[in-house]
Each structure stands twice: as structure tokens, then as C-alpha cells.
Amino acid sequence: MHGEDIHVGWFSSRQIDARTLAVALRQLLAAEKLEQIALKELGMDTAVGAALTQARLRFEDALPDIKHVRDGITHFEDWSRGQGRGPQRVARDAGTLPREVARDHWSFGYDPVTDTVTMGPYTFSVAAALPAASELCDAIYTAARAVDARNTAQIRQQAIRALTDAGVSCEPPTGPVIVSPGGDLRIWLSVVLAVVPEGERIGLAEKVAAAITGAGLCLESTTFPQAQDIARRMAEGETLQVRRQ
């Protein structure tokens, strides 16, 4: 929209971009709602959802009219006749004729001089939309990452508990098995070849694989995900990813 305006026939690239932007901005609110639903279903800490809510409120404060602008675009078959919901319904209920409602809530356009998008009486600033959208996107990502971080911590705890119950130490520096801390949101497991005699490696690897599998987890080779010889790969020093089955 801030670049060159390209005209193809009667169509302006800036006006097309304005429509796309309005719909995309409204979809961010839908994405936030979906994330909130997921956070509740997963039983996440309420602080995660609260932080996301605050980001959404700031987005709505920056773009209070975005819902109506988007509705006018996507429900044009109703808005063009004054039969839309929301503010158009309020106007009809107040006694305004549908054709007058349509007139007052129509005429979409982007004004490059003021850098604003308008739909009838509703408008939003493109300059304000960009940072607001960026912040809400970051907040949605942060909330999703919190879910991943919790899942990673749970997998790590399961793996360590399973190994401990099987009598396999994973405590550095003497433990024969290392379980990664999960900083990359993945859990990795490997045998410390330096502390395990060569003749004992395959037996230890099989014991580890059985313990992990028995805990409802699995070991996966990122080099060859379809590999069935997991114990052999572990015994040879390959680092494997721990996942839920």
C-alpha cells in the first residue's frame, strides 16, 4: 500500500491491498480467540492468557473500527442493502430506512494522503495498524510457545522418571545417559560413550529404549525418522529425540 499504485484496468493495487489488510487484521483477533480457547482447554497458567488478553485490548484500542470495516467488506451483500448486523441493525431498529442505512455505511476506500482506510463512518490508520498487528502476532506466538515449553518440560520429567525407575542414571557428569534441558523446546537423549564400556553399550541402549517406551514416549532419529534400530543407533552415539507416542 505504501509502494507504487499499480492500475490494471479499473483496479488499483492499493485499494485491493487495503481490502486484504482489513480482512487480515480482523483475522488476527480470530487467531487470538482460538489461542485463548486452546489455553483454557490445555489448562495453561492463567497468566499466559491474561498477557494475551492485554495485547488484544491494545490492538483493539489502536483499531477500534476494524471489525466494522471488515464486516462491510465480507458481508457486502447485506451491508450494500442496509441489512447488515451490528451497527446497521442498530440503525434499522432506531427507525432508519434500510436504503439510508446502506448509504451511511458504504463507500470503502484507502486514502494515500491520510494513510487511512475507510468504510462508511468507520476508519483505521494503516500507520497504526502495522505496529498493533506486529505486537498481537508476537503475543500469540509467545502464548503458543508457553504451551510448547510446558509440554517440553513434561516430556523431560517423564523421561527422567522412567530412566530413574529403570535404574539408569542421567545425572551429569557420571551418568551414562544425558537428557537435554529442553532449551530448544525439544528433548534429546544420548549415551555417554566415554563412560560406558563398548561391550555394555547395546545392553544399556536397549534398557533405555524399553524404559522410554514403557513411559508412553518414543525415541526418534532425526537423521532417519523411520529407523527401527533405535537401540543400535543410540549405542553408536547418535543423539535421539524424545517424543510422545
Model region roles, listed by residue range:
Residues 2-15, 50-179, 187-188, 202, ...:
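Acidic, Ser/Thr/Gly/Pro-rich intrinsically disordered interaction regions
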Residues 193-199:
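A short, exposed loop/beta-hairpin motif centered on an aromatic-Gly-Thr core
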Residues 45-46, 52, 184, 197, ...:
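Intrinsically disordered, low-complexity coil/linker segments enriched for acidic/polar
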Residues 184-193:
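Short, aliphatic-rich beta-strand segments
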Residues 32-43, 73, 77-80, 219:
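Amphipathic alpha-helical interaction segments
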